[in-house]
Amino acid sequence: MMWRWSFLLLLLLLRHWALGKPSPDAGPHGQDRVHHGTPLSEAPHDDAHGNFQYDHEAFLGRDVAKEFDKLSPEESQARLGRIVDRMDLAGDSDGWVSLAELRAWIAHTQQRHIRDSVSAAWHTYDTDRDGRVGWEELRNATYGHYEPGEEFHDVEDAETYKKMLARDERRFRVADQDGDSMATREELTAFLHPEEFPHMRDIVVAETLEDLDKNKDGYVQVEEYIADLYSEEPGEEEPAWVQTERQQFREFRDLNKDGRLDGSEVGYWVLPPSQDQPLVEANHLLHESDTDKDGRLSKAEILSNWNMFVGSQATNYGEDLTRHHDEL
């Protein structure tokens, strides 16, 4: 879910400039209300049918993968060659790309969108340019400036906004590990992307429960789970995918089979035990490209299997490519 942050940050800022307040229908700072760990790609992993989009986005990142799709095959391969050189240079510079170097590159790509979103937020929230983001700065930049006791006196549904503000402050206090009410860049990252930090796990679970537990009994019932995904229209037959979600709830979400999700089950759902996704993808790319089976990749091996690593398009590839590729 946090892969949407850069776009959502832009929406939040536009909304703030136009209306002065974030939407009460969104989570903190425009994020989706239910947190999930950051995937390498939302595309299906379907190599068997020649669909390498998942691999492209895992290796390059979604935005850069789209740019490669606009390139000629020759330019795409040339830029891939420069990436290969950079991967090896970041490692031991022995002329080969090891599994560790490939994993490190994919992990770097996975974190790029987080770094970009935090940089944008930092510029917005650090209003006094002192190199830290105070809670007051963040609050005022997000909700507007109010005198104590007058919060949201000028808006409809003031109570909803007060709850949002309290929730943001609670998350900020957890992210602010030294308790000085001033966020470092690392602490602001934890605030904006709590699913990436172990010490933020409890707040992620608490926020998810608050959003889904409509009857406030401390659990997520199956109907509450479904209601977050689907709004039934009168007389409408429930779609097959909703029925599949009900089955998913019963078989995989409700671990103790009591018909509801408690806090630990919510945590297992939204932040499951960590799998090293970059390592899994690195092993996959190595297995598919290591033709001499020596456990490492030469530049030639990567380029010979270039269409698994990056995409291309033979026509109209240069006209709307505006981003500079210095980092590649």
Swiss-Prot record:
For Ca(2+) 3, which residues are the binding ones?
176, 178, 180, 182, 187
The UniProt annotation puts motif Prevents secretion from ER at: 325-328
Positions contributing to Ca(2+) 6 binding? 290, 292, 294, 296, 301
Q: Which residues bind Ca(2+) 4?
A: 213, 215, 217, 219, 224
**What phenotype is described for loss of this gene?**
Homozygous knockout mice show neonatal lethality. Normally delivered newborn mice exhibit normal gross morphology, early motor activity, and response to painful stimuli. They quickly develop severe respiratory distress with gasping and cyanosis, and die within 20 to 60 minutes after birth. Normally developed trachea and diaphragm structure as well as no obvious gross morphological or histological abnormalities in the heart, brain, or liver suggest that abnormal lung development is the primary cause for the neonatal lethality.
Q: Which CDD domains match?
A: EFh_CREC_RCN3
Q: In which tissues is it expressed?
A: Highly expressed in lung and heart. Also detected in liver, spleen, kidney, skeletal muscle, intestine, stomach, and brain.
Q: Which residues form the EF-hand domain?
A: 77-112, 113-148, 163-198, 200-235, 241-276, 277-312
Enumerate the residues binding Ca(2+) 1: 92, 94, 96, 101
Q: What is its main location?
A: endoplasmic reticulum
Q: Offer one Pfam family short name for this entry.
A: EF-hand_5
Binding residues annotated for Ca(2+) 2, in chain numbering = 126, 128, 130, 132, 137
Q: Which domain of life is it from?
A: Eukaryota
Q: Which residues get glycosylated?
A: 140
> How does it get modified post-translation?
Degraded by PCSK6 and other endoproteases including FURIN and PCSK5. N-glycosylated.
GO molecular function terms attached to this record: calcium ion binding
Signal sequence annotation: 1-20
Q: Give the PROSITE patterns listed for this entry.
A: EF_HAND_1, EF_HAND_2, ER_TARGET
Residues binding Ca(2+) 5: 254, 256, 258, 260, 265
**What are the boundaries of the region Disordered?**
24-48
Q: How does it assemble?
A: Interacts with PCSK6 (immature form including the propeptide); probably involved in the maturation and the secretion of PCSK6.
Described by its record, this protein's role is as follows: Probable molecular chaperone assisting protein biosynthesis and transport in the endoplasmic reticulum. Required for the proper biosynthesis and transport of pulmonary surfactant-associated protein A/SP-A, pulmonary surfactant-associated protein D/SP-D and the lipid transporter ABCA3. By regulating both the proper expression and the degradation through the endoplasmic reticulum-associated protein degradation pathway of these proteins plays a crucial role in pulmonary surfactant homeostasis. Has an anti-fibrotic activity by negatively regulating the secretion of type I and type III collagens.
- Family statement drawn from the similarity comment of this UniProt entry: Belongs to the CREC family.
Protein's UniProt name: Reticulocalbin-3
The organism of origin for this protein: Mus musculus (Mouse)
